[in-house]
Regions:
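Conserved acidic segment of CheY-like receiver
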Residues: 2-21, 57
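C-terminal output helix
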Residues: 114-123
Length: 123
């Protein structure tokens, strides 16, 4: 079963992604985090336990403390995470936001509300 890490500071969006997973009956192990740092620490723990890497990580563009682009750039600089698909999501449809996400190393940019089946198609 594919593994998805989802990072968003909004409790509503964290609830929504799990709701959509159930509603769309998407076969995915979903792990949600409210901060970029929590997601990064979880990834490092997965490596230590030799559990493999998640297939996809999607992070919200705008979060306090560290943005989604900050997390993506951090993961791209670390070879241990080179095989993971990385995406940015946002309620923004601004071209500048999309370009900034891709420049940080994101493989794709998604507008909210999210379509979980569409995310998994990006594997």
């Amino acid at each position: 079963m594919p593994i998805l890490f989802y990072v968003d500071d909004s409790r509503d969006d964290l609830f929504y992604i799990d709701y959509i997973r159930k509603k769309q009956k998407v076969d995915v192990d979903l792990f949600c985090f409210s901060t970029a740092e929590a997601a990064f620490e979880a990834l490092e723990e997965w490596l230590e336990r030799d559990e493999g890497m998640p297939d996809i990580l999607v992070a919200d563009l705008y979060m306090p403390l560290d943005s989604g682009t900050g997390l993506i750039a951090r993961l791209r600089r670390d070879e241990r995470f080179s095989g993971m698909r990385l995406g940015i999501c946002s309620g923004s449809d601004a071209v500048e936001d999309r370009e900034r996400a891709l420049a940080a190393g994101a493989d794709f940019y998604l507008e909210k509300p999210l379509d979980l089946a569409g995310i998994m198609d990006n594997r």
